[in-house]
Amino acid sequence: MKHMLQICCKNNNISKEFPIGSSLLDIYYGFNLNFPYQVVSAKVNNRSEGLNFRVYNNKDVEFLDIRDSSGMRTYVRSLCFILYKAVSELFPEGKLFVEHPVSKGYFCNLRIGRSIELEDVTAIKKRMQEIIAENIPYHRVECHTTEAVRIFSERGMNDKVKLLETSGSLYTYYYTLGDTVDYYYGNLLPSTGFIWLFDIVKYYDGLLLRIPNKENPNVLEEVVKQEKMLDVFKEHLRWNYIMGLGNVGDFNMACEEGHATDLINVAEALQEKKIAQIADDIYHRGENGNRVKLVLIS
């Protein structure tokens, strides 16, 4: 006789028995729930987990689709992994940085040693669609952090190396998609076939990864031009460069080496300089007859 466990589904307040070690995806199918959109993740005792997560004790489970913020993050992370895999295959020497949520999508900086052409974007999108059609499973791997550092170091992923070296964790989870390896702080979908809608377009000097609308996931978010917001993000990156901070690992290392106060002082100096520039701009506009009545600083 199989050992069973009790699962209480919060979506319909029904409890059922399942074999110990059942995955959340198996449990979802067992409850025969009727969602208007694809279920992408679940909350197990109010903690977000991927659908490949296996349950070994009695739990409360609530399944989530893309309309939930946690579900949307799972979808976007999984989509970013597909984008990374496509780019790494098409441009082995290139570097991809998913930088900012802007224009109701995600701005991506792709460095391939030249300007990005429309043909490049078309090739990336085509390869992403092929990866989705292949329905490749995402695998989560647990290993000793020193082993994970070695794996990412061999692949030249120095930002991941610094992050893991300063995480303070003895063991680390990373993900594989075919022969592609990456690190994500959060859950991914069971396989690439769970992605049903996306777009990738040229956007200023980079790419814009478009995602489904949260309220109506059957359509993409409308692109809203946000030049000023993009400029603010880019200025923030320049400030980080001045402070020697390219990623979270750099920040962690700076703090470990006792430079936290220096970082704060430099950041405050940059902010004071920016405020002075705003004051100069207000003054010069007044000289030209364009009196400023209201200034909003976020």
Model regions: which residues?
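Auxiliary tRNA-acceptor-end handling modules of aminoacyl-tRNA synthetases
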Residues: 53-72, 95-103, 107-291, 296
